[in-house]
Amino acid sequence: AGPAGAAGPDSVIHSTWIPLSMTLQVDANNDSSYTQSITALNITQEIIDSGVVLSYIENLFVNDGSIVDVSDYGGGYLDVTYNVGVINITSYFGDLSGAYYRYVIIPGSILATNSVLKGYTKQQLKSVDYATITKALGISTTKTTN
């Protein structure tokens, strides 16, 4: 057998752990936030329409190396939006530079066939803890940046 081919369009894709390097933004009302855009070329319109993108971040509040879903982080003070080819992260409670961030892209075809994930809505998947997602999708939990 030859070498394994590249991941196809129906494969789960996950990023390496990305150390955040946020930029201070100050609006006309003198309110500040910290932002970062991450290129994610595998986020296509099809993924946005029928798949799901999940985001996880190192929990800096407890300093124990735990990983949390971004929707649970900061009580709504962290906003992550997904557009074709890019993820935009905005922190309203401080600079998260240095925290490790990872995204997981799950195509709609995987959502329909994965025995663990089948039946979950997109909203339910966004609240599934990191350990469950990595186990269901066979993703390594080792925190490396390469």
PLM regions: where:
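Surface-exposed ligand/attachment interfaces on beta-rich extracellular proteins
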Residues: 21-49, 91-94
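A mature extracytoplasmic/lumenal domain signature
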Residues: 59, 93, 105-109
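Extracellular C-terminal loop/segment signatures of secreted glycoproteins
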Residues: 52-83
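C-terminal partner/receptor-binding element of secreted or periplasmic proteins
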Residues: 98-146
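Residues that flank catalytic or metal-binding motifs in active/ligand-binding sites
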Residues: 49-51, 99
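Collagen/collagen-like triple-helix sequence repeat recognition
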Residues: 1-20
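Structured beta-strand segments within beta-sheet-rich domains
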Residues: 77-99
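Tryptophan-centered short beta-strand motifs
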Residues: 17-19, 31, 45, 62-70
